[in-house]
Amino acid sequence: MSKNAIGIDLGTTYSCVGVFMHGKVEIIANDQGNRTTPSYVAFTDTERLIGDAAKNQVAMNPHNTVFDANRLIGRKFDDGSVQSDMKHWPFKVVNAGGGKPKVQVEYKGETKTFTPEEISSMVLVKMKETAEAFLGHAVKDAVITVPAYFNDSQRQATKDSGAIAGLNVLRIINEPTAAAIAYGLDKKGHGERNVLIFDLGGGTFDVSILTIEDGIFEVKSTAGDTHLGEDFDNRMVNHFVAEFKRNDKKDLASNPRALRRLRTACERAKRTLSSSSQASIEIDSLFEGIDFYTNITRARFEELCADLFRSTMDPVEKALRDAKMDKAQVHDIVLVGGSTRIPKVQKLLSDFFSGKELNKSINPDEAVAYGAAVQAAILSGDKSEAVQDLLLLDVAPLSLGIETAGGVMTALIKRNTTIPTKTSETFTTYSDNQPGVLIQVYEGERALTKDNNLLGKFELSGIPPAPRGVPQIEVTFDIDANGILNVSAQDKSTGKQNKITITNDKGRLSKDEIERMVQEAEKYKADDEAQKDRIAAKNALESYAFNMKQTIEDEKLKDKISEEDKKKIQEKCDETVRWLDGNQTAEKDEFEHRQKELESVCNPIITKLYQSAGGMPGGMPGGMPGGAPGAGSTGGGPTIEEVD
């Protein structure tokens, strides 16, 4: 089997990575020791930060810290949800050519724009590196999860993100399906169970109903809303902005930094309210020197979000209808996603199922990555007993079809059809001697195509002249296991064929663009490495200078060193520290050059000192300069990366 394939849960707010090894899944902690990593990327004057480091500095740098890429990916700039999200985002989203949204930031003093795919790929690189650090070797293959309700263009764009991150994406799978694997993996031999996965995450909401029996996971239906979750935070933020306006007559909305600090406090309060009945918010000097101290009760929060909480039941009903199941037939209700910790959501769900106990046996933050890791192991040929005979049968979330006369949507593949699947239908011409047909492919549930989403179109030309209704054109829809569609059309009389992989020509990145982005990603990575080395060199010089000052002050050595030598070292060290204070952003070789200079003054004196003292008293403080963490590698001691 290939070296470990990993499973990545690429979430809207947090991401998580797992790997299947030695017969079980390991969820891997990042360099900060956290098992989930914020899906944040930040750009500063000197560096690019990803994950915790990016989220930690967001209040100081709100305009250049990008998050929620999942809400942009595979969407058009004019999309209603993109427009409404932009009101809440402190970073700038611009309309790049072809109606694609791009994020605009300042990086190292220049204005840069990035596609949502590139931002997501940076988060994926972080997850990939987290796994590599744990496994001790490079990782190539991955399974990446997406919300079940993602449409074709969103799936394709996620796959492209993987390619930009240098990953070979074995498969794109749906989050609730992945969570079901995490839930059902150890439940073999329990007979057939109908399981409802209720997945309420940081930005999306999915409900899937599966039947699990003897390692076969068959999705019966899926429903959802690609927009929910973070809206809970927005409600609380808006509530406090209004309170601040009432009490202090000031409008917070005009200040991104204040809003960001408030949002961070609201996120924390929301979590607190899942376990206590009230939370306090204390923010010093929030706006124009005014401190903001306030409380919010659980009841108040529930009232602010009442309609949102209630709306989570609609997809549950829809999924049951589509699965042709009654409430009573559901054996297990499994909670996934951080927002399912909200007591009100749990109560509504339990009441909907007539007071049924909810299943909390899996970790809601890690279940999706867990399932993805299992699927990655299966696809890369793992032979271990735990994943033997596991079969995943997923479904297409939306109906797919073509436009026929009068703008009617004719569905070839109905929603919730098990994938992979292939189906053909024969169509004909609308007018006499029509030389060609335009095949327009749509996804959605509405009767008219204008209300559905156009995926792409192509022309089948060269049809021999014939009266209307005579030519026979066979249209074939073929969905692969990633949920990505191929469409072909063939004129039966001539055998002439034309086909298109619906990769959403308008919105999709071309091969060349992906190539270019891969190279840029490499370049950014090299920049990040250089920045790390630069800081290591700076820290090395600083610690060397301070160590020297300490050495000459050492009680044991004080009298062994002449005043003149002492003064020489003292002055050179002070000069170095002064230079450091004024040149924090100098280049690596400047720091190294300064260190050599300082060593040339100190080393002869220190050597003389130790020769006269007869051997080294317990090793020289800080080690010789080579041992300081500047010599290209990170030294022995802990170096602290986070530099604000």
UniProtKB/Swiss-Prot annotation:
Residues 615-638 have a biased composition (Gly residues). InterPro entries: ATPase_NBD, Heat_shock_70_CS, HSP70_C_sf, HSP70_peptide-bd_sf, Hsp_70_fam. It comes from the Eukaryota. Keywords: ATP-binding, Nucleotide-binding, Stress response. SUPFAM superfamilies: Actin-like ATPase domain (SSF53067), Heat shock protein 70kD (HSP70), C-terminal subdomain (SSF100934), Heat shock protein 70kD (HSP70), peptide-binding domain (SSF100920). Belongs to the heat shock protein 70 family. NCBIfam families: PRK00290.1 (NF001413). PROSITE patterns: HSP70_1, HSP70_2, HSP70_3. This is Heat shock 70 kDa protein.
